[in-house]
């Protein structure tokens, strides 16, 4: 067996020490410790054909270090899995530099760029990165075109409130699709699904929030094969109903100890 080099031992020690200090600080704030993404199984797709996927948030509030992102990308490369990561508004909620760090890191490791349409077709196999963006930050996404082109990246845009988007921004979405990116649904009004179902019923949730968000995109020519839950909020009952209408669902994982994730176990 090859002996570990001293430099690697030192880096591992520093990483472990840094994680310990971060957990102690988190405890003083009353929040859970951030887990190593490389040990967060729910964000890795291993080709098992699942219909409900889970991604981890890249936004600043998640406080993911580059070392933690490296751990996730390294695992995907080593095990032939697809790591799922999402974000929202470039610059406002997530630094463009962090987006580039992930995309560049995937390219350097030889990871394929996988969309949720690929998952729906059964072709989303690893090693790979499934990067997605939620909500309506279309101009910000559009400004990432050169970055994506530089690394040959393909991503998925889960768009909410599409019926309220007009003119130039719809043209931007068309161009993003023409570039090879996936356009998917994210509800009409970005409401919490389980709360809506509890108050109004399942039929109303499908009628008011889910199906129109799919149909309005289809009317503009997009083959919509995936749906992302706002806030990742879901139940098995809602999953079953939605999977009658669309093949792939995306929730989220909260990678902190003591914090309950909506991701299926």
Describe the predicted segments one by one.
Residues 10-21:
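Bacterial N-terminal signal peptides that target proteins for export
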Residues 21-27:
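Sec-dependent N-terminal signal peptides
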Residues 30-32:
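C-terminal motif of bacterial Sec signal peptides marking the signal peptidase cleavage site
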Residues 35-36, 50-54, 80-93, 120, ...:
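Metal-dependent polysaccharide deacetylase catalytic core of the NodB/CE4 family, i.e.
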Residues 51-109, 219-220:
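Catalytic grooves of carbohydrate-active enzymes
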Residues 113-122:
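N-terminal regions that are enriched for targeting/export leaders
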């Amino acid at each position: 067996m090859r002996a570990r080099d001293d430099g690697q031992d030192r880096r591992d020690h520093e990483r472990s020490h840094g994680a310990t200090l971060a957990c102690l600080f988190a405890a003083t704030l009353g929040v859970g410790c951030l887990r190593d993404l490389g040990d967060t199984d729910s964000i890795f797709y291993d080709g098992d054909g699942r219909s409900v996927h889970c991604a981890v948030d890249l936004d600043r509030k998640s406080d993911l270090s580059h070392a933690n992102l490296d751990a996730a990308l390294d695992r995907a490369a080593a095990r032939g899995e697809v790591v799922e990561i999402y974000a929202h508004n470039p610059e406002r909620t997530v630094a463009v530099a962090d987006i580039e760090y992930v995309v560049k890191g995937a390219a350097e490791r030889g990871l394929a760029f996988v969309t949720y349409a690929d998952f729906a077709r059964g072709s989303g196999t690893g090693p790979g990165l499934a990067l997605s963006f939620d909500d309506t930050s279309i101009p910000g996404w559009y400004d990432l075109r050169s970055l994506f082109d530089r690394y040959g990246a393909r991503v998925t845009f889960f768009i909410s409130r599409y019926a309220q988007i007009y003119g130039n921004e719809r043209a931007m979405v068309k161009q993003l699709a023409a570039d090879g990116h996936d356009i998917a649904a994210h509800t009409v009004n970005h409401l919490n699904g389980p709360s809506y179902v509890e108050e109004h019923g399942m039929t109303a949730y499908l009628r008011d929030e889910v199906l129109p968000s799919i149909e309005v995109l289809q009317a503009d020519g997009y083959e919509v094969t995936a749906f992302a839950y706002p806030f990742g909020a879901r139940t098995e009952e809602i999953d079953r109903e939605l999977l009658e209408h669309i093949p792939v669902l995306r929730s989220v994982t909260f990678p902190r100890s003591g914090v309950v994730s909506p991701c299926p176990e």
